[in-house]
Amino acid sequence: MTFVYRYYDQAELERQLNARATVPDITPILARYASESARMRARLPCRLSVSYGASEPERLDIFPVATRGPASIFVFLHGGYWRLLDSADSCFMAECFTKAGVCVVAVNYALAPLVTLAEMVRQCRAAIAWVHAHARDFGGDPTRIHVSGSSAGGHLAAMMLAPGWQADFGVPDNLIAGATLLSGLYDLEPVRLGHPNEWLKLGAADVAALSPLLHMPEHAVPLVVSYAPSETHEFKRQSEAYMAAAMALGCPVRFVPLPSTSHYDIVFGLAERESPLAHAVIETMGLA
């Protein structure tokens, strides 16, 4: 047996990276992303397809709240293994958070193979910088931006916590006030060695530049972290490794166990005010 990463041979590595195989059928879950998000757009005040960059995919959807003062902002970066989904599938939590007095922003970004992962990270940073610059236009507080993402979005959200990019975008180093990371990938070396690299085309330099575990936050950012019980060992290991590294740096980390969830439906806990996940996030934002 030849190990290609840690103690995985190639076949086992592919199994570890195959999140889709952990659920019987992904189709109804994806349909629920779309239908629940459409319901939010139909029933809540919102500003849709607001441009934050030069290309068509660089747009975001905003769900403001009517508050007396500037509100916290929950920014969501969708998953899809960096090649699927859209902001239109990603605002299912809007009612839960706006009822709690939190503005919601669902970010769209270009996908592989149209763009590189480095460009996706750049676009998400541009979106966060846009939110910071325009927050007061929709009742948001630019000092209380909480970023969140699931799966590939968890990776992208963690890259928003990395140091070294903020000056290029004209934002403060401590821009992010908190983060929620769900079932993310934070070490891209196994991704480079596995089937996702068919569309990502990562090289060793990309792994070094774009792995959140190699670019941990320099500020003590409060984190909420979770993953589903049915995740593969590698997905669980990566979340555990990121949490350990963050705690070692002084970040307050709250792990939320979520029984009876999967890699794909774990995000719906953000849409249910009484769920442990939504409660933890809102409490971390100082609003519970």
Segment roles from a protein language model:
Residues 1-288:
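Alpha/beta-hydrolase superfamily serine-hydrolase fold, recognizing
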